[in-house]
């Protein structure tokens, strides 16, 4: 989850540890298939194009295959809603069993957003400083040059290049 802007999302994130809990049997079937056929759900995960596009995938069975490893949550902005705080139907936006396996860094969460742990080092609570503070959408969600998100590596989103293109 890299370089996103979450506006009034409840929750902004949802990451569970299903392989360590209620779905613990499913990974066992995938592990058996990988050992017998060299595939997971019929996909040759350890061969191109998967092994070249996702090099860490080739070793997925060698290091706690049931754990939600490899998830990176970095350089995101959250305004309103809930960043990592449980809300409504969701018992947890980030399951506690999953947290030790995550890499979370350089995220900016606006003071108006709900957070589970305000002392977390995975984010800073700060105004992201949209160019058009009163109506970020009208300002195409562009950030002021002094934005704390830009200082943490967030890249401006190219909204002018996103969307439908006319066919030739």
Located regions from the model:
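C-terminal accessory segments
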Residues: 65, 119-168
């Amino acid at each position: 989850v890299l370089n996103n802007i979450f506006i009034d999302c409840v929750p902004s994130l949802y990451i569970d540890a299903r392989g360590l809990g209620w779905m613990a049997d499913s990974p066992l079937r995938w592990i058996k298939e990988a050992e017998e056929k060299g595939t997971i759900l019929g996909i040759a995960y350890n061969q191109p194009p998967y092994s070249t596009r996702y090099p860490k995938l080739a070793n997925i069975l060698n290091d706690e295959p049931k754990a939600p490893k490899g998830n990176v949550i970095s350089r995101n902005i959250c305004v309103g809603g809930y960043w990592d705080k449980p809300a409504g139907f969701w018992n947890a936006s980030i399951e506690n069993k999953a947290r030790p396996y995550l890499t979370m860094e350089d995220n900016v969460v606006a003071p108006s957003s709900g957070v589970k742990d305000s002392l977390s080092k995975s984010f800073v609570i700060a105004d992201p400083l949209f160019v058009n503070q009163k109506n970020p959408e009208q300002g195409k969600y562009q950030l002021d040059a002094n934005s704390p998100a830009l200082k943490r590596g967030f890249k401006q989103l190219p909204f002018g290049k996103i969307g439908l293109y006319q066919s030739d």
